[in-house]
Amino acid sequence: MYQPDFPTVPFRLGLYPVVDSVEWIERLLESGVRTIQLRIKDKRDEEVEADVIAAIALGRRYNARLFINDYWRLAIKHRAYGVHLGQEDLETTDLKAIQAAGLRLGVSTHDDMEIDVALAAKPSYIALGHVFPTQTKQMPSAPQGLAQLASHIERLADYPTVAIGGISLERAPAVLATGVGSIAVVSAITQAADWREATAELLAIAGVGDE
């Protein structure tokens, strides 16, 4: 039963790019994307605050679901749509503050044990990864593959889910066929020969999500 302690999100968030700059946020929102995450790693809050402010403003302008990865204090301060946290961030984050601010929460998972941890937090959605090998970030866990992803989806039933990790344009239909609500992509867009074409094709497959 989907009863999060945080505001709900649609079961289908649609195409969900994860990018590291305001420039990419603006490009992709202009191209029709309506769910997106700003993920800037390993900087102090004061170093990223201007980017967080700009990204949130763009999200509002385009009526988009803009998630801030990790910088939850800034997300609360500037009223982002939501926050996304990794497993390692859950213990050091004031989840009640995020909840009280009315922000949505997404949590990363890599196996059944981490899904248990995520479910205990009752987030708005659960991210499942990494599905395929990925060069975007160093991963201590092994790729889960489609069969394991489908097993997680069956377990989570009506919980909004996002698949992430090595999802290319070619692999996207098979990933969505597992029943996962959304697909997060990184290099499939940012490293594409033609990012506009890649974005349009991925939007045609994954959509923009439910209202």
Curated annotation (Swiss-Prot):
Amino-acid positions noted as binding 4-amino-2-methyl-5-(diphosphooxymethyl)pyrimidine in the UniProt annotation, renumbered to this chain: Q37, L38, R39, I40, K41, N69, S108, K137
Reactions performed catalytically: 2-[(2R,5Z)-2-carboxy-4-methylthiazol-5(2H)-ylidene]ethyl phosphate + 4-amino-2-methyl-5-(diphosphooxymethyl)pyrimidine + 2 H(+) = thiamine phosphate + CO2 + diphosphate; 2-(2-carboxy-4-methylthiazol-5-yl)ethyl phosphate + 4-amino-2-methyl-5-(diphosphooxymethyl)pyrimidine + 2 H(+) = thiamine phosphate + CO2 + diphosphate; 4-methyl-5-(2-phosphooxyethyl)-thiazole + 4-amino-2-methyl-5-(diphosphooxymethyl)pyrimidine + H(+) = thiamine phosphate + diphosphate
Domain of life: Bacteria
GO biological process terms, semicolon-separated: thiamine biosynthetic process; thiamine diphosphate biosynthetic process
One GO CC term, this protein: cytoplasm
Binding site for 2-[(2R,5Z)-2-carboxy-4-methylthiazol-5(2H)-ylidene]ethyl phosphate: T134, Q135, T136, G166, V186, S187
Cofactor: Mg(2+)
GO function terms (MF aspect): magnesium ion binding; thiamine-phosphate diphosphorylase activity
Keywords assigned: Magnesium, Metal-binding, Thiamine biosynthesis, Transferase
UniProt cofactor note: Binds 1 Mg(2+) ion per subunit.
Pathway(s) annotated for this protein in UniProt: Cofactor biosynthesis; thiamine diphosphate biosynthesis; thiamine phosphate from 4-amino-2-methyl-5-diphosphomethylpyrimidine and 4-methyl-5-(2-phosphoethyl)-thiazole: step 1/1
Pfam families: TMP-TENI
Main function: Condenses 4-methyl-5-(beta-hydroxyethyl)thiazole monophosphate (THZ-P) and 2-methyl-4-amino-5-hydroxymethyl pyrimidine pyrophosphate (HMP-PP) to form thiamine monophosphate (TMP).
HAMAP family tied to this protein: TMP_synthase
NCBIfam families xrefs: PRK03512.1, thiE
Record-given protein name: Thiamine-phosphate synthase
